[in-house]
């Protein structure tokens, strides 16, 4: 039996999903053209903070939370007509998550290469 490594899975996902820069994500977010979704776990948010104007949906709940019948979508917290931009700490989990959303049928999905750390370096602000 051959088991793929996480690195192989991420590499495969990166070949299938759109990767955007932190600067591109910042522009989309400032123009209110995207749902900026932080898929890091709660411990990471507590330790490092959350990006302003982002939604927190942990990776393990993403598929359930972003489905059109979910309360996030039903309560207009997430607008599925906008681009869905995912980020994690460094970009691996968000690439995998973006691939999963594409498999679910979402068309306008991307992830931020470099993740939270690079986003902070490029000027994203954290919530206080």
Segments (PLM) and residue ranges:
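Rhodanese-like catalytic fold shared by cysteine-dependent sulfurtransferases
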Residues: 1-34, 42-83, 92-128
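Short, surface-exposed ligand- or partner-binding patches at beta-edge/loop junctions that are enriched
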Residues: 87
